[in-house]
Design a protein with these regions (language model features):
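An acidic-aromatic pocket/loop used at catalytic or ligand-binding sites
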Residues: 2-6, 24-68, 133-239
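Short, intrinsically disordered, charge-biased short linear motifs at domain edges
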Residues: 8-11, 71-78, 111-113, 155-164
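N-terminal export and membrane-targeting signals
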Residues: 1-16
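Short secondary-structure junctions
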Residues: 69-85, 126-136
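Long, charged/polar, surface-exposed segments that mediate recognition or autoinhibition
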Residues: 96-143
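C-terminal motif of bacterial Sec signal peptides marking the signal peptidase cleavage site
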Residues: 19-22
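A glycine-rich, hydrophobic loop/mini-helix early in the fold
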Residues: 73-104
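Residue-level signal for mature regions of secreted extracellular proteins and peptides
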Residues: 16, 81-82, 166
Length: 239
């Protein structure tokens, strides 16, 4: 069994696969491509892990990773917009219909690339995710992506040193197994319900669209932080 974590090569964050074996060698059942984290073959739609199983087993792990980052950064987490569960068709072809979950975009402050590396190793080792990163920009920012290409799950992190970083995750289009009833009637938990104990706040001002500073975790009132804004901290994100 392998686990996807953040590792380091030449001083730069990369996503790697740590091989859990006695001597650290690639198992015979694993190809070199798999060991290097290259894309897996896509599973036929009907054979993918169901959306219900994703919501029960996979999404809580990803939310736990976001929680751990927020706790490392002081206990607050911003969000924009709300999480969604929508009907989808496989690759938009209209051939097979299923359901797609997308988390809200979540914002955390005061975390470093080393924090992300360490927390990913602790929280995400049980997921079959493999990943890539963009080249590091001059300001040290990175885009990190990891996913289960066989079933369509993906997580994306926009890391900005010294400012707030953002992440979101989604399931990809998956079949329903019916175990949670009619999904048209299913109500997703709110961000506050997903992250009890954290200070949850809207990431942007409703009127101006400007980034909101994280509230004080002691009072719940808006705080002052030079890590809450900046022209680049939402690069690549849907507004």
């Amino acid at each position: 069994m392998s686990s996807c974590v953040f590792g380091r090569a030449a001083g730069v964050l990369v996503w790697v696969v740590l091989l859990v074996s006695g001597c650290g060698l690639v198992p015979r059942s694993q190809t070199p491509q798999e060991a290097l984290g290259l894309p897996q073959a896509e599973t036929p739609f009907a054979e993918r892990v169901s959306i219900e199983e994703y919501l029960r087993s996979e999404e809580p792990v990803l939310a736990g990773f976001a929680r751990a980052l927020a706790e490392k950064g002081g206990g607050s987490i911003g969000f924009q917009p709300a999480r969604q569960l929508q009907i989808c068709s496989d690759r938009g072809r209209g051939e097979e219909y299923g359901w797609r979950f997308r988390s809200e975009t979540l914002y955390v402050v005061s975390v470093t690339d080393a924090d992300i590396d360490e927390i990913a190793a602790q929280e995400l080792s049980g997921l079959p995710y493999k990943g890539t990163q963009s080249p590091m920009h001059g300001d040290g920012s990175l885009i990190l992506r990891s996913g289960d290409s066989a079933n369509g799950g993906e997580m994306e992190i926009f890391y900005f040193p010294g400012r707030r970083s953002s992440l979101h995750y989604e399931s990809g289009c998956r079949p329903s197994d019916g175990s949670m009833g009619d999904l048209n009637e299913y109500v997703l938990p709110s961000t506050e319900e997903v992250f009890p104990g954290l200070v949850v706040y809207p990431a942007f001002d409703e009127d101006t669209g400007d980034p909101n500073p994280p509230p004080s975790t002691d009072t719940g009132q808006p705080g002052q932080s030079d890590q809450s804004g900046g022209s680049g901290d939402e690069s690549g994100e849907d507004q």
